[in-house]
Amino acid sequence: MRVKEMNESLRPREKMKINGISSMSDEELMQIILKTGIKEEGVEILSKRVIDYINENDYKDLCVEELMKIKGIGMAKATSILAGIEIGRRLSLRKAMDSFSLNDPDSVAEIFCNEIGSCDVENFYALLLDTKNRIISKELISKGTINQSIVHPREVFKSAIKKGANSIILVHNHPSGSLIPSNADIEVTKRLDKVGDLVGIQVLDHIIVSSNDSLSMRKGMYF
């Protein structure tokens, strides 16, 4: 059955208007994004195939070319899907940053777990804070295995000094999923902590994240 053949109250747009967005299934939301199906199948079947494809793949790695491999998805539909995903990601990140609390390492993890927790390479970030411990910005410092040649104090503190940060929190992911700090993690953290003392920008913590968990190196007394 095609959308136009449905009872009006069951059509995705009308259902959203009557019952609210929380009443919508993933497939129904995708129907609104896609708008139309293809000659061989209606938008409801196409939407289910798209949702199944996204669930089977890491949505963070999706691109226009990848989505266009799905039968019935051209450039217009692919870009609409990615735009919807990106808006959701940005709003989620903004909410996590707004709810950040210095006393809660989990609030740092909430910012980064979805973004880098499942990445297959290490991403090293500095979270810059002002004198009231509010987030100024998050800065990507490096990608690749953490060591002292890649994570240089100059790169870590350059943005912090330029943006007037009072303190920083270091964050990086472990592609293996293990949260145990490596010797390189500990050495780099201790070095950056000392440099922070010298330049007057305190390193408050170093958080290691996976896709669904985190570890505070400060609480673990690794530095």
From Swiss-Prot:
Keywords of this entry: Hydrolase, Metal-binding, Metalloprotease, Protease, Zinc
GO terms (BP aspect): proteolysis
Origin: domain of life: Bacteria
S-S pairs: none
Residues annotated to bind Zn(2+): H172, H174, D185
Locus of motif JAMM motif: 172-185
Location of the MPN domain: 101-223
Gene3D superfamilies: Cytidine Deaminase, domain 2 (3.40.140.10)
Coiled coil location: none
SUPFAM superfamilies assigned to the protein according to its UniProt record, in alphabetical order: JAB1/MPN domain (SSF102712)
GO molecular function, one term: metal ion binding
CDD domains assigned to the protein according to its UniProt record, in alphabetical order: MPN_DUF2466
A Pfam family of this chain: RadC
Family indicated by similarity: Belongs to the UPF0758 family.
Name under which the protein is recorded: UPF0758 protein FMG_0357
Organism this protein belongs to: Finegoldia magna (strain ATCC 29328 / DSM 20472 / WAL 2508)
